[in-house]
From Swiss-Prot:
This is Probable septum site-determining protein MinC. Pfam families: MinC_C, MinC_N_1. Interacts with MinD and FtsZ. PANTHER family: SEPTUM SITE-DETERMINING PROTEIN MINC. The keyword Cell cycle applies.
Length: 225
């Protein structure tokens, strides 16, 4: 009969495999017995991190805590993480949002802050004092005079494209580039340009067609909202 609980050494270290065919009660009982049988094992005397593989199922926080407690109380092992082959509804929703292009046709006025979890396409202008925050890339088909923050949660591979005018500011992750100097004050129109973080960790402003070379994956974007 196949065991519901197995401890194996893998290339990533020690893993505990819990069958997704067994009930949580069966797993708890079998895990407790297995660890009790291994009391005199080579793991004792030193804490070892283990991964818990739970297959095609998800554990609640309470179930994870119960498994963690059994391992903590009956061995010298500590859980580094639980790994599942499936995704929760919340995680799936977040993944879908990150992989999606959000779009609006409007003017972002002073005091307005638009924040999206994925890429963002704006058909319209961003006025001084207006702000866009996107976890992904930002594309503006209009004049940018406000603040554009791409890669808001730290993605330095994000890019910004649009017409950058005084006194706009571009932020990518934690990098900042300002168009607030006197050189930009007299510019009333410009072509579309792109902004991205280069190999020296600085924001560079370049011609729009350079995006395809710098970030070739952008040409594969699909979808919208």
């Amino acid at each position: 009969m196949k065991k519901n609980v197995q401890i194996k050494g893998t290339k990533d270290g020690i893993s505990i495999f819990l069958s997704d065919k067994a009930s949580i009660l069966e797993l708890q009982q079998e895990l407790s017995q297995l660890l009790a049988d291994k009391k005199q094992n080579p793991y004792s005397g030193e804490k070892l991190e283990v991964q818990v593989q739970i297959g095609n199922r998800l554990f609640s926080e309470e179930e994870e805590l119960e498994i963690s407690t059994i391992i903590h109380n009956n061995s010298q092992m500590e859980i580094s993480a639980f790994y599942s082959n499936v995704m929760s509804k919340d995680d799936a929703k977040k993944w879908k949002e990150r992989d999606q292009i959000f779009s609006m046709a409007t003017i972002i006025r002073s005091g307005q802050v638009v924040q999206v979890p994925g890429d963002f396409l704006l058909i319209g202008d961003v006025n001084p004092g207006g702000q866009i925050r996107s976890n992904g890339n930002v594309f503006v088909l209009g004049n940018i005079k406000g603040i554009i923050h791409a890669g808001f949660e730290g993605d330095k591979n994000a890019v910004v494209a649009g017409k950058f005018l005084y006194p706009s500011q571009v932020r990518i992750a934690d990098k900042v580039y300002g168009f607030d100097s006197e050189d930009y004050k007299e510019v009333v129109d410009t072509d579309l340009f792109s902004a991205f973080v280069n190999d020296t960790d600085e924001i560079v402003i370049d011609e729009i067609h350079k995006i395809r070379k710098i970030r070739p994956e952008i040409s594969n974007f699909q979808g919208g909202r």
